[in-house]
């Protein structure tokens, strides 16, 4: 699929992006805005100063809502008001080192936060597609020379990686339990490490 096909698909669609103030979420939101989508973002305040979200010029070009995905009541309100057709779930506690410092917050955000988003998807038939963006850290680390496959075992052991493995299991459970008839497409994708302009977070491979 080329960029024109992406733009044609998203033009005019109501899209909810969780984690829109983060690095990946900001770039994704900018692409969607440029494609002509009606974008709503739901996230904590930008995690860095300077913040890519402000630098990208997205304020005023999308519906930016500051909130915590652990807050189910607020999420329900947002879904009811915005009626998204597509939900792209990127919000997370994303730092391995921070997960050792505060594992409870990491699990609450990455596991129960995902449950909350999926529950809102379940309750709102306007949603036709949900994507949970996780990480390549979900795999059991076998220390082998070749790349991991989608069918390889999940066994992230640190709190961050494990919470993302759990997030995938939650997504799988909801897909089998509530969306087996296909009225809403439920999927996950596993992102690797990324680099790019505006990445000011700690512990990055190439920080800006």
Task: Please report, for each region that a protein language model flagged, where it lies by residue.
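N-terminal Rossmann-like NAD(P)+-binding domain of SDR-like oxidoreductases, especially those catalyzing
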Residues: 1-191
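Glycine/proline-rich active-site loop of Rossmann-fold NAD(P)-dependent oxidoreductases
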Residues: 124, 165, 182, 195-208
């Amino acid at each position: 699929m080329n960029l024109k096909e992406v733009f044609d698909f998203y033009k005019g669609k109501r899209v909810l992006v969780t984690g829109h103030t983060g690095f990946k979420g900001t770039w994704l939101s900018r692409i969607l805005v440029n494609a002509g989508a009606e974008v709503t973002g739901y996230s904590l305040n930008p995690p860095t100063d300077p913040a890519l979200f402000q630098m990208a010029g997205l304020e005023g070009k999308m519906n930016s809502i500051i909130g915590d995905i652990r807050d189910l009541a607020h999420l329900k309100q947002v879904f009811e008001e915005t009626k998204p057709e597509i939900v792209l779930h990127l919000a997370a506690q994303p730092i391995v080192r921070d997960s050792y410092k505060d594992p409870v917050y990491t699990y609450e955000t990455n596991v129960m936060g995902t449950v909350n988003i999926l529950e809102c998807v379940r309750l709102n038939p306007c949603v036709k597609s949900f994507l949970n963006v996780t990480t390549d850290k979900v795999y059991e680390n076998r220390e082998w020379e070749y790349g991991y496959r989608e069918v390889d075992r999940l066994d992230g052991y640190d709190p961050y990686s494990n919470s993302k493995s759990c997030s995938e299991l939650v997504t799988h459970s909801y897909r089998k339990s509530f969306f087996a008839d296909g009225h809403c497409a439920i999927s996950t994708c596993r992102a690797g490490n990324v680099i790019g302009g505006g990445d000011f977070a700690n512990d990055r491979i190439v920080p800006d």
